[in-house]
Regions:
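A short Gly-Trp-Pro
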Residues: 1-143
Length: 143
């Protein structure tokens, strides 16, 4: 599987672990702030399954909490991976994959830190398939 940042300056490849891809959601404050989102979608992958294809020199590291390094693109700011140095796995940012990972989330951690305003399953939220060129939503999905 290949992934890239928003500006495409950084790209990577990751092979599926033999045991399958373990995907989770994290609602901790650190992930919410780092990703400017109500949660982060991650996959734990062995380091040996990951390699940079281009732009590794454009990555920067931020230690967001003691011992946790977040790697991001210095051009566009996209979060790429996180790691605890010395551990055998990396935390891949699933939303940056350029294809369907073929697995779905199996856990949601730090639910105690969820934001109260984000209930994307609520029937009160209108759903649209895309955003049109005129700046209007297109093809409302009522499901």
């Amino acid at each position: 599987m290949k992934g890239s940042c928003l500006c495409s300056a950084v790209a990577y490849e990751v092979s599926r672990p033999a045991a399958g891809l373990h995907i989770g959601l994290c609602s901790c404050r650190s992930c919410r702030k780092a990703h400017a989102a109500p949660f982060n979608v991650y996959a734990s992958v062995p380091r040996e399954n990951f390699r940079w294809l281009r732009g590794e020199d454009k990555t920067r590291i931020y230690e967001s909490s003691p011992g946790k390094n977040r790697h991001f693109c210095s051009v566009c700011g996209s979060q790429l991976v996180a790691e605890y140095p010395g551990e055998s796995n990396l935390l891949l940012r699933v939303a940056l994959l350029d294809e369907d990972p073929g697995a779905r989330p199996v856990e949601h951690i730090f639910r105690s830190q969820q934001v109260p305003w984000c209930d994307w399953e609520s029937d009160a939220i209108a759903r649209y398939e895309e955003w049109g060129p005129s700046g209007e939503p297109t093809a409302r999905n009522t499901q």
